[in-house]
């Protein structure tokens, strides 16, 4: 059993997790293309996934129902209105130039994950489409793109910053994995990318009332999480602070966030409401 609070050299880690779960639907979130792992590159791509002009997305009802199941399993509030947003940014593996996601009206809000020794609050869980996959190791001088993953339905589960140690974070991830596999909404296969995790981390004095500067660690796994406590102090206590760190020895990327909420609103990020009332 993990300790509820872990203070290291007078500092208290504060951790919030964003878990991306690929849902077990037959087709993608907004297109009729099949949702299946391991097929030949670009063999499961629809016109919608390619972002061609004139195509219109239709929401996958099965993905919506699976999101609702997760919300019920975590005693969360279920949205009565389905509203989606466009998150605009520029990646080679995102042909549309934006990702369809939920910002203002997520399908799930205010859930609870019970670890036995403490409860971790879920801020929200929202539906969004996955991006394609860029591969840089196939050819010496060129990168290639596989759009099979483009449009695959994701449920992004965002916790509140209630986690206070790496071992608590691992317990939380194991509990999320247990829930999604028991509900049969995802296979939770981390090696295939069915369950991916980003961590928002900071440190504070135990008697402080405000959190410290937040850093985001992308694409971590349980083995890295187990050593986060000591690495966290090394990263954040170094000075001066950097906006971006590439940590080659642990294979992840750290980005300091200087915005007041979960969503980055930098030069390449803006939001436009995208409404859908179709559940077919």
What positions do the PLM features span?
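Basic, nucleic-acid-interacting segments
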Residues: 2-262, 278-280
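Intrinsic low-complexity, disordered N-terminal segments enriched in polar/charged/small residues
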Residues: 273-277
């Amino acid at each position: 059993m993990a300790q509820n609070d872990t203070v290291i050299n007078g500092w208290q880690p504060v951790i919030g997790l964003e878990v991306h779960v690929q849902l077990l639907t037959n087709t993608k979130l907004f297109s009729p293309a099949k949702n299946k792992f391991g097929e030949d590159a670009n063999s499961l791509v629809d016109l919608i996934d390619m972002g061609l002009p004139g195509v219109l997305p239709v929401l996958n009802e099965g993905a919506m129902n699976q999101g609702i199941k997760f919300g019920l399993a975590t005693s969360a509030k279920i949205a009565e209105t389905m509203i989606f947003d466009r998150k605009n940014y520029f990646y080679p593996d995102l042909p549309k130039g934006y990702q369809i996601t939920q910002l203002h009206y997520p399908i799930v809000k205010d859930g609870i994950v019970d670890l036995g020794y403490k409860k971790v609050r879920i801020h929200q869980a929202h539906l969004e489409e996955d991006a394609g996959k860029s591969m840089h190791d196939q050819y010496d001088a060129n990168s290639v793109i596989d759009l099979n993953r483009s449009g695959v339905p994701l449920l992004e589960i965002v916790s509140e910053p209630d986690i206070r140690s790496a071992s608590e974070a691992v317990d939380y991830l194991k509990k999320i994995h247990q829930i999604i596999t028991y509900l049969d909404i995802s296979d939770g296969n981390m090696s295939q990318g069915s369950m991916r995790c980003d961590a928002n981390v900071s440190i504070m004095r135990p008697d402080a009332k405000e959190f410290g500067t937040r850093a985001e660690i992308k694409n971590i796994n349980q083995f890295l999480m187990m050593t986060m406590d000591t690495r966290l102090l090394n990263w954040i206590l170094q000075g001066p602070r950097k906006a971006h760190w590439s940590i080659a020895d642990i294979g992840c990327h750290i980005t300091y966030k200087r915005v007041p909420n979960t969503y980055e609103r930098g030069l390449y990020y803006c939001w436009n409401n995208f409404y859908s009332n179709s559940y077919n």
